[in-house]
């Protein structure tokens, strides 16, 4: 059996692993890095263009990031944090573009206004107050608000055409929002990594087992599903960035920090339109409010998508119930993840979230006509024949123990790392890929503390991410500086012709 030594083993060929590998190779090109992917291509699960919405999540249009509190206030803390995190991604991508590590920005990111759209007096009041609170902060100072139908006709013509003129509507807009093809971004970063002789990519190599040895390193067994046989990687550090597949791998590792975690898988579907005469009439990501009782991941939105240079429209998502952790996974994934240490939390979440489960099952059983009826709220003239149904990627929400030992369901991402810093796993979903760079900086800070204490690594991180070590939420001058640069380098300051 072949045994290969590696300083770093990246499990999963998606945006998370690729971002970490790219950052580490910039910090120390002599590192021996191996990436393993169970499929025969990188970026084919959640990172693949049509498996996600491609929204550069910045909190501009996503109303679920600014929830109303019990006393009628609006909490904006999460929106500020997500916006600042996305600015970190933009800085790193700009750095790579400037140094040839990424191609022309329009191959992976395009300007696409981010807009929120609501109707009815109560939701309009909410949106107006949200705008007042957010636009008072430097991160959101360019956000516009309007309840004038003529202005909205200019912002989102497809949404406003043939709408009831008596219906009260309102919207906000940030002109320099973005549509990101995370598949293209990831493939290009992998191609650049492959130019370094110290990087190796192993496709069609799923992980069968991983075990820590007495010297603190990791013995990782791989199977070669293309040619047969197996390989062993002897790794100093392992990152589990396998999307929904990260939880089962974390469980295989046996680290104590992974005890109690479970996964709640949610499937997704989109309505897609590629008819040029319709696509050309909409150029924005228009987000609404989730229906009462709907989970946060089901916020409806009508989006411009540009994947492999081809424009299209997307509407959804339509969530559904599933037991798979990956789109290409097994229906037994959920059941296979149940352990003695997470059985209680999983059962607790199941019992306490029966309404959510019923909602997901109901969503999955909708007809095409039912789905198009939802679309009519955002495109009054939509015709069934113009739209087709597409399967999105899987999202595995986090189940974890609360302070009372019961289970709670979390809609976010979380980094789980071993005490000795030799293994880390990223669990969860939204906002996901948009904050990949910030998430991988967290991995470096937790698992490469000794190296990060050196002046060389700190200086290099500062070069890659000029805001590193400082708060974009608190520092308006710094935000203005980095945003001006990234909008220019990535071409996000250009108005659409």
Swiss-Prot record:
One of the Pfam families matching this protein, by short name: Mqo
Catalytic activity: (S)-malate + a quinone = a quinol + oxaloacetate
GO molecular-function term, one example from the UniProt record: 2-hydroxyglutarate dehydrogenase activity
Gene3D superfamilies noted in UniProt: D-Amino Acid Oxidase, subunit A, domain 2 (3.30.9.10), FAD/NAD(P)-binding domain (3.50.50.60)
EC code(s) of this entry: 1.1.5.4
Cofactor(s) in the UniProt record: FAD
Family, per entry: Belongs to the MQO family.
Protein name: Probable malate:quinone oxidoreductase
Species name: Hahella chejuensis (strain KCTC 2396)
